[in-house]
Each structure stands twice: as structure tokens, then as C-alpha cells.
């Protein structure tokens, strides 16, 4: 029984996992749905019209503190999850980066996945319910291969390496990429990987050592 248990406890072999091209995948989100930064001459009136309680008050406090930090030449670091990118807010974040208001961005590994896919094909967010049924969930090969390539760059953080790669590879929709814009503007974009929580970690091409090292560089 102990021998069987030891055998059963061996790590699974990922080499036989089947991947497919992301170009064949149905996506739930595309760049046509993205938000766009626009100028509002009287936007202050809208902000002032909001209730003086709870979320609206919190929003005003965030705005005030960002403005104060910017005016005092302090750092404004945006820490985001993947939904900021998935839900079409990248262009607004990029606009704030270009204006010198956001001075650094920290994102999780899923954020990097969405950012890369949007830069490559102009869409992201697979149909999870469908792909779980047929076993294809997370198996788009281009995303995993690109992030692994970036992670393997010596002494470079994953965020910068992936941003550089998006620019070097001339991804068709790179103007929607926070990672690429960070590399172009030389603004720190850090990616904080959590092994096992992101779809690409199932791919045979992925090196846990490279993921850990490149993300640790970003952490530092």
C-alpha cells in the first residue's frame, strides 16, 4: 500500500498535454468593447454631484490623493487584478501612464495573460463553460509560449521582458497593451505570478524555475 501511495504521489507528466492555436479560440471580450479616454470640460461637476457617502466619497478621496501625489512628484502605483484589463480599461490606464500620473503598475499573472492576448489577437477571455466541457480550457499555446520566452530572459523581470517581446514581435494590437506601453515609456510594470493559479502553468513548455525567478525580480 505504501509503495502504491508513493507512486501515486509523483508529479503528473505534462508533456502529453495537447494545445491548440489561440486563433481558433472563441473569445468573450474584444478591443471593440474597450473604454476610451476622453476629455470632459465639466467632469468636476459630475464628481461633485455624486453622493457624499460610501463609494462615491471613497472615489473622491482616491482622486484627491492621486492628484496630491502627482503634484508633489510622488509615485502613483496602480495594483490591479486581471479584470481591469479583461473589462476594457487598458486604454484608460495607458493614457494615465502617458500623462505621467501612473508611475508604476503591478498586476497578477492572469493580468499578463489577458494583456498579451489582447495585444496579439485583439481579444481575450475564453468561454470557460464550453472549454471545461471539451477539455480545452487554458490550452491556447501562443500565450504560454510567449510568457515562457519572456520569463527565460536572464536577470529581467517578467513584466518588462513580456512588454519588450510584444514590441519586438510587433503584435498587431500592441497599443492596447499596458506591458508594452510600460516598456516603451520605461515605466515599471511588474507581474506577480502565483504558481498553479494561472492557465499557462499546465503547459509543457512552462518552467517553474523561470516563472519564479522572473516574477521574483519583479517583486524586488
Q: Language-model segments: which ranges?
A:
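Metallocofactor- and cofactor-centric catalytic cores in central/energy metabolism, strongly enriched
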Residues: 1-220
Amino acid at each position: 500500500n505504501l509503495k502504491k501511495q508513493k507512486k501515486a504521489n509523483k508529479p503528473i507528466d505534462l508533456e502529453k498535454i495537447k494545445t491548440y492555436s489561440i486563433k481558433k479560440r472563441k473569445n468573450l471580450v474584444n478591443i471593440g468593447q474597450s473604454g476610451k479616454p476622453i476629455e470632459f470640460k465639466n467632469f468636476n461637476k459630475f464628481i461633485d454631484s455624486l453622493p457624499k457617502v460610501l463609494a462615491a466619497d471613497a472615489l473622491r478621496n482616491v482622486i484627491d490623493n492621486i492628484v496630491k501625489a502627482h503634484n508633489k512628484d510622488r509615485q502613483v502605483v496602480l495594483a490591479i487584478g486581471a479584470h481591469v484589463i479583461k473589462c476594457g480599461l487598458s486604454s484608460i490606464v495607458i493614457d494615465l501612464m502617458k500623462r505621467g500620473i501612473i508611475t508604476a503598475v503591478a498586476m497578477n499573472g492572469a493580468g499578463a495573460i489577458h494583456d498579451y492576448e489582447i495585444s496579439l489577437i485583439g481579444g481575450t477571455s475564453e468561454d470557460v463553460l464550453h472549454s471545461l466541457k471539451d477539455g480545452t480550457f487554458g490550452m491556447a499555446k501562443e500565450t504560454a509560449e510567449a510568457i515562457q520566452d519572456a520569463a527565460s530572459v536572464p536577470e529581467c523581470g517578467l513584466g518588462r521582458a513580456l512588454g519588450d517581446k510584444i514590441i519586438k514581435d510587433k503584435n498587431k494590437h500592441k497599443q492596447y497593451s499596458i506591458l508594452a506601453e510600460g516598456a516603451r515609456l520605461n515605466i515599471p510594470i511588474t507581474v506577480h505570478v502565483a504558481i498553479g493559479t494561472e492557465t499557462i502553468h499546465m503547459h509543457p513548455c512552462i518552467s517553474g524555475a523561470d516563472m519564479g525567478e522572473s516574477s521574483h525580480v519583479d517583486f524586488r
